[in-house]
């Protein structure tokens, strides 16, 4: 416990809570403070100017980060016929229909993403109570229900992140690992913010991206100066 206290004291001494950091300075600070015995993820929290109580202002989608997330993603695909072969060629780890559903029902879910072709939703629909709470239910809004399952598999393997605002209008996701270099983390974050801006609901008024902060798995959040990021959407 004393070790944790020392770590937290160090973080509090180094991080100015009210300061908005240049992205490169922020990344350098996170790297300095990342002392866990594993390679920590770099996570981002984006406060959006939306009313999360209104369904037409909720933001949900997916985007492929240019440098991936640093995680090896296992993909399960519900499909059949030619699509099954295409999914396997694209690198899917598990492909099937009823047989794959039986594995899920048994609790054998050694995968991170589930993709389904539209004709397979009759099977996947029966698994909603299992996949839904785990955030694994395929959804066309994030490209995981699609006739082009091969592309969905490639995107997932390439480092696609899915995002969805919480009840406070905040997006939480990951943009890589602490051992990525600063330029990679910056470009990943910029790609995410561009995707979010493109997903801005038409009914959302005022400043859309209100605050951006990054943190490591075990570290404190560092607020960013958005002027140091290139997030032009045109």
UniProtKB/Swiss-Prot annotation:
Cross-referenced CDD domains: Ribosomal_L1 (cd00403)
Biological processes, Gene Ontology terms: regulation of translation; translation
Record GO cellular component, one term: cytosolic large ribosomal subunit
Pfam families: Ribosomal_L1
Keywords for the protein's UniProt record, in alphabetical order: Repressor, Ribonucleoprotein, Ribosomal protein, RNA-binding, rRNA-binding, Translation regulation, tRNA-binding
A GO MF term: rRNA binding
Keyword Hydrolase: no
Family: Belongs to the universal ribosomal protein uL1 family.
Function: Binds directly to 23S rRNA. The L1 stalk is quite mobile in the ribosome, and is involved in E site tRNA release. Protein L1 is also a translational repressor protein, it controls the translation of the L11 operon by binding to its mRNA.
NCBIfam families from the UniProt entry: rplA_bact
Protein name, UniProt field: Large ribosomal subunit protein uL1
Source organism of the structure: Aliivibrio fischeri (strain ATCC 700601 / ES114)
Gene this protein is translated from: rplA
